[in-house]
Amino acid sequence: MIRTKVAAARWIGRLSRATGRGGGTTLPGRVLLKLDPDAIDKLGASLRNGSTVISATNGKTTTAAMLAAILRAAGREPVHNRAGSNMTWGVATALLEQRGDEGLFEVDEAWLPEVAERLRPKTILLANLFRDQLDRYGETEALADAWVEMAGALADSTSFVLNADDPLIADIGRHTGPSTTYFGIDDDGRAVTEPQHASEAKQCRVCGEPLLYERAFVGHLGHYSCPACGLARPEPDLSATEVKLLGMDGLKATIETATGSHSLDLPLPGLYNLYNALAAIATAQAIGIPPGDSVAALSRMKAVFGRAERIRIGPSELSILLIKNPAGANEVLRTLELEEGPLTLWFALNDNIADGRDISWVWDADFELLSGHVGNVVCSGTRAAEMALRLKYAGWPEQDLTVVRDIDRSLEVVLEDGPERVFALPTYTALLELRELLADQDSATRYWQS
């Protein structure tokens, strides 16, 4: 009976693509789950080598792409929701559309407990939890509580890979089994002494007292301890040292493991991508791939859809950097700070459901970092005026700010003088609009094909 339902859902996917209504990354799964609510359980059980599940607020698409590249280099082709459709229907679509012996699924933070209960994965990577879409998710502690409950239920059957530098994630290790791997950064030169915003401060998950930070790397990720109960950051099994950031050209670091050191040359920018790489290498090790092999595979890594992706449009190179919350935006801004100015920038701030209706997060992002480092700036999207206002208050020259709400027209405006490089910073639905626009112009493939 499941075969008939799968066939019907596959036909829906082919029809969706043929009629130009999308890439068929969600609709087939929605149809299948309507026909059989237990389809994920049944199809997941057919993966002979089990599945790996990845979740995080920031970086899950890139980390999943990194792990997929590592697996392919090892001769293992996973069933993978690579287009980033990461709720139940996206996972179901990947399971019915692809064939393979093991699964690799990025999963939305709120949907993770349900997907994990259905898939019973061999390995779960939990990379970070940041404030994001508060109108949808609520505070991060609520998600952490749900993840703790999930981890306890799976502790006997699932290996966990956890970010030692995120106190919300590391705490989950108190509830997992012995097969738990930690990763983190150990480079004082890339740290500040504490999280930069009060909203990023964290309380001890054991006793509730404020944590003290020895150093912080990205938002609340860092080295911390509790002065009240003695809780401390776990010692990582894999860590990054000797970090050198090269702006948009990538980064270099040494990856320290129990079996030796490996030189990572990653062609993706920023500390956030170093965390993504560490997460992928640690997870690959948990599923049987040596760190040295993973490091070699990542040296050939290409940017995924909208995550430091570069696209040529006539004489201009468009670098696309997704922003969706303060922590992620700050890391993009820190990366751009290393670029030679003045910078040509294109912002697209939307407030659609998939972006989060609440755009107040832009006031917590450090746009002040680029004050005095910018040239032509175009703001677009449904909340273009609010984006321009935020930049004005960040000290960006008002005469350099242009508001063009329409994404199509705004792109024409920012490109009309043929700048050598344009840095595009869209929110999620604006990124989808941008990619479709570029695909219509034959400048890029559609997002589900990238």
Say what each PLM segment does.
Residues M1-T26, A201, G208, V218-R233, ...:
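ATP-dependent carboxylate-amine ligase
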Residues R3-Q203:
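Phosphate-binding loop of NTP-binding sites
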Residues V31, R72, G260, Q285, ...:
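Short polybasic/polar patches that bind polyanions
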Residues T57, S85-N86, A258, P269-L271, ...:
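Short, surface-exposed acidic/glycine-rich loop or hinge patches that mediate macromolecular interfaces
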Residues L67, L71, V91-L95, A277-I287, ...:
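Buried hydrophobic packing segments
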Residues G90, E114-V115, D135-R136, D171-G173, ...:
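Short glycine-/acidic-enriched loop or helix-start segments at secondary-structure transitions
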Residues L126, F130-S316:
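Acidic, Mg2+-coordinating active-site environments of NTP-dependent enzymes
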